[in-house]
Amino acid sequence: MKNLIRLFLILFVAGIAIGTHTSCSEDSDCSIAGRAMINCTLYRMPAPSETILQNDTLHSLTVTALGTDSIIINNQKKVHTLSLPLRFTSDSTVFIFYYAYREDPTLCDTVYIKQDNTPYFESMDCGYSMKQSILGLGHSEVELDSIYISNKQANTDGTENLKLFYRNRD
């Protein structure tokens, strides 16, 4: 009889532990880490005699979004790739790239991205999310020479979306 009661208690406690574990294990990732971004890689504008693209590195970069007080990248050093969020509430996003923010705030380029925002239902926990794709873009040409769209869909896996070509600064 004691063994039967002991077995019942063990099964009862094990059932509660398993039930608690499985009910809490399906947490959805609604964090900012799950948000799709535009991933950019920096390249040096090739000379006419060059046939191979070479990666570029900016000494310093600060990126802000026009119309907000947010700093997306704050004085990051040795930049060769960056991930930028697109706006959910508008069909365009404007980024300002400051190359020497503290020394010369006028040394900057503006990148204008026109995007398509398509809402979709993700889950009961997360609600709606947004699929975003680039429709077109424009930019100033202070330091930036050109931009090539390599993938129009914003993504979470780090796939390159934009190739940013900078003039040779040597």
Where are these regions (language model features)?
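Bacterial Sec-dependent N-terminal signal peptides
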Residues: 1-34
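Intrinsically disordered, low-complexity segments enriched in glycine/proline and serine/threonine
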Residues: 5, 9, 47, 79-81
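Extracytoplasmic cysteine-anchoring/structural motifs
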Residues: 24-32, 37, 41, 78-170
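Intrinsically disordered, low-complexity segments enriched in polar/charged residues with Gly/Pro
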Residues: 27, 48-50, 71
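Structural motif
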Residues: 41-54
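Solvent-exposed strand-loop boundary residues in beta-sheet-rich modules
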Residues: 46, 67-69, 101-103
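Extended low-complexity, serine/threonine- and proline-enriched intrinsically disordered segments
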Residues: 51-70
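Short beta-strand segments within Ig-like beta-sandwich modules, predominantly Fibronectin type-III
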Residues: 72-78
